[in-house]
């Protein structure tokens, strides 16, 4: 026996109970079923450091909608959940916690630190998982993964070794983005550019051979200590005489060459640029072209280098342990140990004192910052591991261009291709302890490098057993790039999950990580599995606050989804995040929107209670014979068929917001506001067969409507569904209504809609005239569609407050004291004089007429003004013409009503 619905719906408690039941029954676990087509989504793994924010809530809601929809369509729908180890963020959390205990990484050692990191992950890392469950995510938790679990680690090692053996991973001294705060390199994609106030300092370098001064400008004067050349353009006529000459570096007195290079732009400034190969990416390339030495003047924690730094590197070089391309290190003397900013001030003061600072020019420029800590990035030459991007990028670009993978919206295809074409080799090593340690070992005796999945026992070159593993870890995105297939059992290509569920289908993610993650998954999937990892990338925007601002800690405008869920329920939050949203576009959060969605939930609950309360104990669900269906039944069933087809089409095109909106409108405006009200007449009438037919249609439509709504609002739909007679174990495994061949009665629908339009017009007129519903009167309806209005007599009596209705093709009787109500299909004559205060109504109408004529005059004057018609935008002119026509129509109707009142 279905349980009775409570008087009010209370999501608190109810949602937790329902979710636990889903988990206990294993409804989210997807079996491999060869008779079904698989549909697979892998969750973009949230960081173990994180907690649910509005961006997560939207991202996961979209994925859950698609998963539930496909599950109901009969697919073997798998949504793989998991979390990311988040190297930099997690390490920072653990280091901060240790700092509170007076400890550092170095004090506890690598093993001790990793033990603490795993403890931290196990204590706090699953917090976000429990929060995802609060949202209603129907993930297969039995397949939950972590980017550092055994399977993912095996995949990471496999890929690293393969790429190394193919020559696509290499180690070398290259220019990298260095974060002095996080004390690690980061990739180009992880650098965020911020507009900052700064200066152009114009410096004077004396030419050794001629004694003249060369003027150049820099935003980073502290790096001049590492200059190894200045560059001019070979075609610049101003400096033809200086080809092959040298300048003397101010403060240091070091002679450096003047080189001719296209990097020097004749049109910019003086056309002279300082070249610091160890601290600028462009200068690094100039240095390679001219075989310039590299001199490092900054330590990895952002201080100027000193004697000890120089001695350490010199010793490595003397012992033959340093690579040939290892930069030299300068003892910066009096500036040693200063931070870069401290050194900048001191160097500028000294340059000014010796006459080498010509002028200071203020400017606003884009400065690279770390995406994690927002510290200013220092470009550094450092020995790191890199992935060669060009051979991997080419097939990844072709796959998208050929349509094997499509972006929704399509405009993001360009973002992806531009990023893939413009990227440098990917720096994948990080100077961190938490993460996948690079599977490379170095022989302490001969320096041989061994890359392997397992630690080598001896050096293959000299036989030594003194092998040391590279201390660095891999970029977090290296393991995340393998996520679509490492989560399904790869590199074991015989794994059942891999063979059945891979390639995956739809990736749902934000536009901000197309470069970070989407691109890398695409080239990884193609390179290692030979298949595109997914066929569709569905891009969503970000959730902004009600003023359109990005949510941030600094603004204090962040909204905690869990607090919203606690107050309004997960269904209301989910519906708010989907209604009105469109792929690729940002949306605004507001409490008012969530409240409106909660009100919709209450409306649905109350309507369902009404239906349940009108069912006898022996009620048998199912549609009645067609002969027992009246016009309103055929109309609601036809509307159901239409909304099911439309919602299906919208979901198939990833128009999730439109689908949700149509289902909500059907339930609220069509089913609740109209059909239920219409059924009350039959339910309370004496015709038992008509009442039973109404009950059957009410239940049938409610059942289908709940199924259409389920992907969007899973909790309340499950709770109501379980209270319906004949319900199955769970709504989530029921058949999706849009796949059924539901009948549409076009003629009956058209007739009923004519009737509805007329009823709406009568009710609007009565409301304007302040006529109480209890005051009823007769009416004459003039129409070319008499059948519709003759069949609808009962509806007119109840909803248009008619005592009796006369339907005619042409009304020729007296119109004295009658009010005219017109729709496109009918003209009604209603004797309202007996129901109203004539003088009061005339006063109201005359006031309305004055207002309408004022509007009429305003629009007429605008359109009679040649300047307006000629110079105003065409759209505005058309809108004004439309407003004029509406004002004319309104005034004419008011005059008719005044005339009718005599």
PLM features: residue spans?
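Non-catalytic terminal extensions that flank enzyme cores
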Residues: 1-54, 77, 371, 604
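Residue patterns forming the tRNA-binding/recognition surfaces of aminoacyl-tRNA synthetases
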Residues: 3, 8, 17, 21-25, ...
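N-terminal catalytic cores of NTP/NDP-binding nucleotidyl/phosphoryl-transfer enzymes
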Residues: 31-94, 147, 156, 216-219, ...
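Short, solvent-exposed turn/loop segments enriched in Gly/Ser/Thr/Pro and often Arg
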Residues: 34-36, 44-45, 78-91, 144-152, ...
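Extended active-site and interfacial segments that coordinate phosphate-rich ligands
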Residues: 57-65, 214-250, 273-280, 290-298, ...
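Secondary-structure transition/capping motifs at alpha-helix termini
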Residues: 68-76, 97-110, 130, 134-139, ...
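Feature 926 captures the class I aminoacyl-tRNA synthetase adenylation module centered on the KMSKS loop
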Residues: 202, 418-478, 482, 527-570, ...
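Active-site-adjacent "gating/activation" loops or surface patches in catalytic cores
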Residues: 252-259, 469-502, 669, 673-676
